Amino acid sequence: MQELNESIYDHPKYYDLVFGADCAAETKFILGCAEQYSSRPAKRFFEPACGTGRLLYSLARRGHDVDGLDLNPKAIEFCNARFKRHEMPYRAFVADMSDFRLRKKTDVAFNTINSFRHLPTEAAARGHFESMAGAVRVGGLYLLGVHLTPTKATPSEGESWSARRGHLTVNTHMWTNSRDPKRRVERFGIRFDIHRPSGSVRIVDELVLRSYTMRQMKALIDHSGLWEIVETFDFGYDLSDPITVDAASEDVVYVLRRRQNKVTGK
């Protein structure tokens, strides 16, 4: 099998398939949170690190206005091409999620699959929350999914899954390469094994992510003083089953509400 050492984000067709399995559940969860926790009906939705825009497209099909950004031009091109094919307006653009501005404030923002952890430093992470505060209206929501590092349980070391669309099959494997708690850097190997009638190819990449314990994440959210945690869920996206985040928690979706006034002294 031919092996390519390339970024998985430079292959949006395969990425879209691999991470598209939960799209219906995620869309239902996003809309459910908007209905349950937003201060008024949500019409505009925004996704930082939108990738191929699968969730943006799912929401747009339901009649919502959407915006998205991503650092990878190939992902944005793929995202906007899908909207264009379906003769729908698109506004996904290339930008850094730690420093950006939206032309119009959104009602609900979401980043559900751990992309936030690509920001390498505390300064970048704080910049993200400041930028998000500028993007989300007062009383609006930010749904942030993060894979935390547990401090009272053994962290997960890997996972595998498969996805298929027509004659295309992608088998995905992830594994831990290293963890450095002091530097807060975790390295994960990821592999796409791609099988088509014309042949097979393997794409191998390494993801370098900043780590967060429960306490570190709470401190980061509190730092800007512009967000309050109104509820937390796991990656099962079950609105009837919120969780309490503790030292054993790993997969967490924070439902954050934009405050009207900045809270200081935390």
List each language-model region with its residue ranges.
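Conserved SAM-binding loop
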Residues: 79-80
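Conserved SAM-binding loop of SAM-dependent methyltransferases across substrates and taxa
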Residues: 52-64
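A short glycine-rich, Lys/Arg-flanked "PGG" loop and its adjoining helix->strand segment in the class I
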Residues: 126-138
